[in-house]
Amino acid sequence: MVRNNNRRRQRTQRIVTTTTQTAPVPQQNVPKQPRRRRNRARRNRRQGRAMNMGALTRLSQPGLAFLKCAFAPPDFNTDPGKGIPDRFEGKVVTRKDVLNQSINFTANRDTFILIAPTPGVAYWVADVPAGTFPISTTTFNAVNFPGFNSMFGNAAASRSDQVSSFRYASMNVGIYPTSNLMQFAGSITVWKCPVKLSNVQFPVATTPATSALVHTLVGLDGVLAVGPDNFSESFIKGVFSQSVCNEPDFEFSDILEGIQTLPPANVTVATSGQPFNLAAGAEAVSGIVGWGNMDTIVIRVSAPTGAVNSAILKTWACLEYRPNPNAMLYQFGHDSPPCDEVALQEYRTVARSLPVAVIAAQNASMWERVKSIIKSSLAMASNVPGPIGIAASGLSGLSALFEGFGF
């Protein structure tokens, strides 16, 4: 029997599908459009660099040195700079006075320290019973900066032989405790008050009685109470504070002669209206040579019974003097720096941003805080159209180079 081993071939069926879609047309070699590059950001960066470089030629280095002198501590910078870059044009002598001194605070007493805008005088000090304020019998005594006599002479009648007027850029003070941690006690309180020098016609206690135009201080009542804006902390933490010019302009004040006390001799405290006395001591050592346009810093250190409180008191001030033509200092003078509106605006911005005082440990980072305020302010100002924005952008570029300039 023959088997049929032939397999049937299975025929493959083709399935044809009909569609209405058109077949894709082969693309021709069409050149592609170039990719758009984001030139706007790059253009802005180029413009920013151009503005910064352009501002480098217009903004003066004295403007930056002015900010550094006003706000940097003396252990960081002792350069007095070229002066205040405002619209004043004339010959000036710049000076940065610095005093470091050890001080002991009497137990069961409150010690008051006044950092006042008095050229050549570092601070005024007096102590009163604990828990009280100065009264009419209290006398604040002067402690001088080094070099007082070289600037203002040894006689009260020759204070203006070298310089005729002055103005402040800033005043600073720091108290750095050195007490044993097991022996200290007490607190530090800081506030500020505006004190001004005034000329008033007063009766003079002479025989026969007469009257005279004498100098007196107004605003000292602010020392007799802690202001609403104040700083209070434990003594061991210390304090750092500074005062700047709050007036619209940096105006010069005259150098005064023949004044050793306020109120003057033969004028009583009750007659003058002052709540207490200020005495500079012997005229060969010190004197009251003027009063600038700065808020006075008031520091009260309270030391209870049994406390052993000691500290290093450091105070410094940046001033600008107008030298007399026939004085030796005239040869060391220089022209006042050109006006730098942006630097002056940043001075005001920093002044508004700083607190009344901080603990002493934060003084080391104070210049870093000032730089951050300047950079933040200039970043906002650089968006302003016109020359102000251009100048701000340029100074912002300079502020980024502070480290390179030693700032």
From Swiss-Prot:
Active site: 75
Record site: Cleavage: 363-364
Disulfide bridge positions per record: 69-318
Biased composition (Basic residues): 1-12, 33-48
Keyword terms, alphabetized: Aspartyl protease, Calcium, Capsid protein, Disulfide bond, Hydrolase, Metal-binding, Protease, T=3 icosahedral capsid protein, Virion
UniProt-listed SUPFAM superfamilies: Positive stranded ssRNA viruses (SSF88633)
Residues bound to Ca(2+) 1: 161
Family indicated by similarity: Belongs to the peptidase A6 family.
Protein name from the UniProt record: Capsid protein alpha
Gene name, Swiss-Prot/TrEMBL: alpha
